[in-house]
């Protein structure tokens, strides 16, 4: 992969997340070139102009282009996929699965054609099933396909916990495993505040289990809460920031440990599925799956999450 000074990143899907991510990457100058691709070509070109002009004010020379032609993603170092449709009223879970699976399949085939050496970060929901689709239809190696979910879920958990304890969020380190949904598993033993495990804070009386249970539940419903408040949209700043965090570790070979939807081949007792687990992200993509010992209770919740993902994958026709 090229260095961050010459790295090219393509964003497939120029909606709110794609636009916010383009601005973040351009402002931080983590990459040299950005490409936005979307079926709505005119909208994409307008967003390119808007973001590009914002970057001019910031003194950023990141080169940004866009349109509807997939050929523009050729020779990308990384491709972020946000394209897809949200679940609409009257649409079944299976409808959403198969509609977005078709979208992801088309994107996967174009990535295989134009950028087979890229790292692909999938954001499209239902997340874990869509990452599996990308892997299946692109033919890319497993270490080059990953889903963004755990970074976002962990950020939400950290935010809520920091607010509750009235401390800097920089003092909080959280780890969330499992699928991107109601069965995500925040690991309290591996989550810390000021280096002190949350479990120890509970035992010392600084936190109580009722408060933590409420924070966990709010984290699980974090996306839904934002949708209800916005009424006409969904979260995009935090998902974009989560993608930027992953991309920085990849482009700069930082080898940061973060929870992502990654391919499991026996780790955590799971095979041939993409599930949210801690991984090391470096210049080769997913360089290692980090296995944390789980208690029987944690393993049970994790297994439920895995079965839900397996059911989603099986439902794709």
UniProtKB/Swiss-Prot annotation:
SUPFAM superfamilies: LDH C-terminal domain-like (SSF56327), NAD(P)-binding Rossmann-fold domains (SSF51735). It comes from the Bacteria. Catalyzes the reversible oxidation of malate to oxaloacetate. The keyword NAD applies. It comes from Anaplasma marginale (strain Florida). Pfam families: Ldh_1_C, Ldh_1_N. GO terms for biological process: lactate metabolic process; tricarboxylic acid cycle. It is an enzyme of class 1 (oxidoreductase). Its EC number is 1.1.1.37. It catalyses: (S)-malate + NAD(+) = oxaloacetate + NADH + H(+). HAMAP family: Malate_dehydrog_3. One of its GO terms (molecular function) is L-malate dehydrogenase (NAD+) activity. The active site is at residue 180. Belongs to the LDH/MDH superfamily. MDH type 3 family. The gene is mdh. Substrate binds at residues 87, 93, 125, 156. Keywords: NAD, Oxidoreductase, Tricarboxylic acid cycle. This is Malate dehydrogenase. The keyword Phosphoprotein does not apply. NAD(+) binds at residues 13-18, 38, 100, 123-125.
